[in-house]
Amino acid sequence: MSQEIGIFADILQTNKDKSLYMKSFLKSFFSVMIIVTACVTIFSSCKTEEKYDFVFDVPGQITAAFGAEIVIPFTAENITSISVASQPKGWSVVDVDMVNWTITVKSPTAFTADDSSVEENGILKLTGYTSIGTIVYATSYLSLLNQQIDFTDAYSNCYVVCQKDTRYTIDVTHKGESENRITPADVKLLWQGPKAVVQYCSYDSAKGEFTFFVGHEDITNDDKEVVDTRMPGGNAVVAAYDDNGEIIWSWHLWLTGSDVEASAIRTSAGDFMDRNLGAYHNGDGSVDGDDIYKSYGLYYQWGRKDPMPRPIDYSFTKNNDEYVYGSSDEFIRWKYYDDEDGAGSAEFAAANPLAFVLGSKSNDYDWLYSSHDDTLWSADKKSVNDPCPRGWRMPAGDAFTAFDIDELEDMAQLGDVKGMYGWHLVDRLTGVKMFMPGAGRRSFENGVLTNVNNYGDDYSPLPWIGYYWTAGTAGSKSTSLFFDLNTTRAVNNNYEPQKQMYRANGMQVRCVRE
């Protein structure tokens, strides 16, 4: 009996040991699973938060030389290796320097128009690999150009850009055409309109030069097939910055359809440009909306070099500005300042080219708040603030007294001339004509665009009016050309060649040859 009890006790002890073993095993298993889960979670978290950066320092590289080696800097963080994913035909990658973060590219050694083995332009694509194997791409535009224009010896506040598919270089160490020199810490594209008409910008601080590229726009037929290309139209402003990131000067890039030198109009009052400053062309009285719009130039407050944008379309829809963009394609808005914003000085205006300075009532609606400065523009000697390109200047205060509205247009029926949005002016001495668009003005009170005369009503405002600044002054005001379209008066259309206006108004400019 005692033997049977012992056997039974052994069985119980064995089962107890097995139970304890299973408990220990399960406890260990779940502990391991918890640890594994924690490790997976940590690893997953680390992977999600992986930091890296791989980008070229400038978006594009342009060379005018065959077989040239170009050293392109790039920024890389947590990139352990790099390979070339693709490159334009005929281009080669000579070296990838992982110490100094540069890549050396060689342009094609030869090129002909029918050579399919060479691409004049294209994208260089690099593949970067992070420490845990993440793949990252960086791209840069490469272009081999035979066309380049150097403006560095012809420094000015405004540069006429009228050749497509060309690299341009400008001086960024002079204020206007003066010998007043600056040393910018940086130079960048401030705004442009339309988007991406100015590309691949770079600043060479050692030379004090800024380089940019202007391509082309396609011309298509009715079947949307590209049949040709042309110079793109638009405007841009480039700004120089000091070490604190403050603007110290800026320059206007005027992308226009043809050479303004070749198309100048000779009159008894001087040689005038055939188009407004900032316009693509002169519509010459066309009633086509696109032609009218391309005839509109930019707007300037009297005495300032800084251009302000056109309306969004030729008919001034809701008086809205055209869209303009920054260097990263962000939308840019102008700011409107009054005497409570610390504005109202020439220094403030130069440092804030995106500012419309509202007129000060206490100073007779000048954008200068404590005085008037008649020397900001001059017809005798081109001033540092003159907005016209080199070789051109603001017209004298009496320049438009030599003209009048073309008689046939002046006497025509309203329906025959309303759609022209402007008048042909006739030189009374020589009979030479030039068309002046009625592009309105920006109000000195609020900066808003307006292009209606005073003779419509609230429900049916009637276009149009023309205001053009001259360099002339009269007391606290400045001299402008004014004309309008007669819609209700029993007299001919209004033409005032020396109308005195508040200096805070924004008006069109028609430059005259020096």
Task: Identify the residue ranges that each predicted region occupies.
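Sec-dependent bacterial lipoprotein signal peptides
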Residues: 3-44
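Bacterial Sec-dependent N-terminal signal peptides
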Residues: 16-19, 36-62, 66, 135-147
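Short proline/glycine-enriched turn/loop motifs at strand-loop junctions of beta-rich domains
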Residues: 75-81
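Short, surface-exposed loop/turn segments at beta-strand-coil junctions that are enriched for proline
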Residues: 108-117, 219, 228
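A short beta-strand micro-motif common to beta-rich folds, especially ectodomain repeats
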Residues: 114-131, 232-242
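Short, exposed coil/turn segments at beta-strand boundaries within extracellular/luminal domains
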Residues: 129-137, 244-249
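Short, compositionally biased
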Residues: 146-382, 474, 503-514
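C-terminal, surface-exposed recognition/capping segments
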Residues: 237, 279, 357-514
